[in-house]
A protein has these predicted regions:
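A short hydrophobic beta-strand segment most commonly corresponding to one strand
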Residues: 96-98, 152-168
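A short glycine-rich, His/Asp/Glu-containing loop-to-beta-strand
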Residues: 53, 57-82
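Short acidic-glycine-tyrosine-enriched beta hairpin
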Residues: 111-146
């Protein structure tokens, strides 16, 4: 690219930064998030992400695209209609959740019961906030449950996931201290 022209973060460059940060900080969610905050923010500044990816069958949303996939790491762009709510659920792997467009209420939970009673789960919120475009959160053990709701029409999110989702996922009702198990439509 000629000197002096602005450059955009490419999806590949962002993926390379995430891979490097995962090697250095993978077991420490706060350090990992700090290391990838700048490249993720630069990627989220792009106005063309909706046209970059390829279609993906979503697990919790109707519209989802792969922006990047290498067999382990995936970047997923998705849309949630205004008022659309994704029930609290787990993944079995860490996930970065970021807002690309609009605002979303995002809550991260950790499970506080011992898991010994089928269908019963007591959750405690560890991060509950309204996130705006450009903001990100890590959903990782032991706080590896999250749910979200779109507060604006056209709200879009980006998730970065390493590994496969577990096939049988828990979908929680925090008010009723309960969960149901559902089979994931897509493990990646």
């Amino acid at each position: 690219m000629p000197a002096g022209l602005p450059t955009q973060m490419t999806v590949r460059e962002c993926a390379e930064a995430v891979i490097a940060a995962q090697r250095c900080h993978g077991a420490e969610p706060a350090a990992f998030l700090a290391a990838i905050e700048e490249p993720i923010a630069a990627l989220l500044e792009r106005n063309d992400l909706r046209g970059v990816g390829i279609p993906r069958q979503g697990n919790n949303v109707d519209w989802s695209q792969y922006l990047y996939f290498d067999g382990d790491l995936s970047f997923l762009l998705f849309e949630v209609p205004e008022g659309g709510r994704v029930q609290p659920h787990d993944h079995g792997v860490w996930e970065l959740f970021a807002v690309y467009r609009g605002r979303m209420r995002h809550t991260v939970y950790r499970r506080t019961d011992d898991g010994s009673v089928a269908g019963y789960a007591k959750l405690a919120a560890t991060d509950d906030r309204v996130m705006r475009a450009g903001e990100a959160a890590i959903v990782a053990p032991p706080a590896d449950i999250h749910g979200f709701c779109a507060l604006d029409g056209g709200a879009m999110g980006l998730t970065v996931v390493s590994g496969q989702y577990k096939p049988d996922r828990h979908y929680y009702d925090p008010e009723a201290n309960s969960y149901v198990v559902k089979r994931a439509a897509n493990l990646r």
